[in-house]
Design a protein with these regions (language model features):
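Membrane-embedded alpha-helical bundles of multi-pass transporters/translocases
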Residues: 2-362
Length: 362
């Protein structure tokens, strides 16, 4: 056992425990990416321009809080370590605010907008408070780089599993739990997600351990750290690239439900083994997003080999271009070309899915 600890070999149970943290997080992140616009315009009922501004403001604010939270977490000292405690301390507030975010209050428009700004920015702050330390935990879970790579792979598998769960089940679940009341369905769905998230975060907290101690270095202030970041050109380039990528993912995902609801509508489709059936926009959207998640997972597997041969930067640029073109081409298709729409989704997701992996690896 001492030899195992010395070389940093982790049990499979601990590797799985870490992955549960991303399973919890992506239930929310994938919802924001796929259904943000639809929820706020068609369920919450605020103007699209207000919803778009809300998203933009929160993204800019999030870029600031991410940096600050990283500095705070790095200075945290507890008996549980630097990073694990945040999973314990904030999982319940995160779940509660998640329910409030997807609650539609009986307010006038101004009151609704205030509610939306407060709750959405608060859920994003809590997301940052949990996920910045959670991501950093990967670096201290083992001194063995091969073990950390394995844990990272499991983390991405859990993330894509959560993406598939959201894509396949969220819209049907809101219908089922709402009993005809769409707003109530969203609120109850996030009660379910919230309970699941608490359990998953606690599994990640309980099942992992911080083993790599940070070296004692000269203490610096947050102000000094920020000054060094601002003058760091590679960091600035990576930040702009990350913002561009997130905006692409957000726009691509957020218009999907509206596209199927108002452009595609209900379709009669002939499928092998299922015959000819009629599908409404909820089923088509869920199928479209699920196909995208599976394609993204396959893309992540493929890019791990391609990046070694052609380079991470080259593959990122190539895949980003293909993803953008595949997404743009959908505009030129009609509702009757549903098969081609799904094929472009496969191409766009196969190349778009691995972008986050390549981005973090550069």
């Amino acid at each position: 056992m001492s030899k195992q600890k010395e070389i940093g070999i982790l049990s499979f149970k601990e590797k799985l425990s870490y992955g549960f943290g991303d399973l919890a997080s992506v239930l929310y992140w994938q919802t924001f990416m796929l259904y943000f616009t639809f929820f706020y315009t068609d369920v919450f009922i605020i103007p699209a321009a207000v919803a778009a501004t809300l998203f933009l403001v929160s993204r800019i604010f999030d870029g600031i809080t991410d940096t600050i939270m990283g500095m705070i977490a790095d200075r945290t000292q507890t008996r549980w370590g630097k990073f694990r405690p945040y999973l314990l301390w904030f999982c319940v507030p995160f779940a509660i605010v998640g329910v409030l975010t997807f609650t539609v209050p009986d307010f006038e428009l101004t009151g609704k907008i205030i509610w939306a700004y407060v709750t959405f920015n608060l859920i994003m702050i809590l997301y940052t408070i949990i996920n910045i330390p959670y991501t950093a935990l990967l670096g201290v879970i083992s001194p063995n780089s091969a073990e950390r790579t394995t844990v990272s792979s499991i983390k991405f598998i859990f993330a894509f599993a959560a993406g598939i769960i959201v894509s396949a089940t969220l819209l049907p679940m809101t219908q089922s739990l709402g009993g005809g009341n769409e707003a109530l369905g969203w609120q109850r769905s996030f009660m379910v997600y919230g309970i699941a998230a608490i359990v998953f975060f606690l599994i990640a907290f309980k099942g992992t351990k911080e083993r790599v101690l940070s070296p004692k270095t000269q203490k610096t202030s947050i102000k000094q750290d920020l000054k060094e970041l601002v003058t760091n050109k590679p960091w600035g380039i990576l930040l702009l690239t990350t913002i561009t990528f997130i905006l692409f993912v957000a726009v691509r995902g957020s218009v999907t439900v509206h596209y199927f609801k108002y452009i595609i509508g209900t379709q009669s489709i002939q499928l092998p083994f299922f015959g000819n059936n009629t599908y409404d926009f909820n089923i088509l959207t869920s199928a479209y997003n699920t196909v995208g998640q599976i394609s993204s997972l396959l893309g992540v597997v493929a890019v791990s080999f391609l990046a070694k041969k052609f380079g991470k930067q080259r593959m990122f640029i190539l895949f980003f271009i293909i993803a953008i073109v595949s997404t743009a081409l959908v505009k030129f298709l009609t509702a009757q070309q549903i098969g081609l729409i799904f094929i472009l989704q496969i191409f766009g997701s196969f190349t778009g899915g691995p972008l986050s992996v390549l981005l973090w690896a550069m």
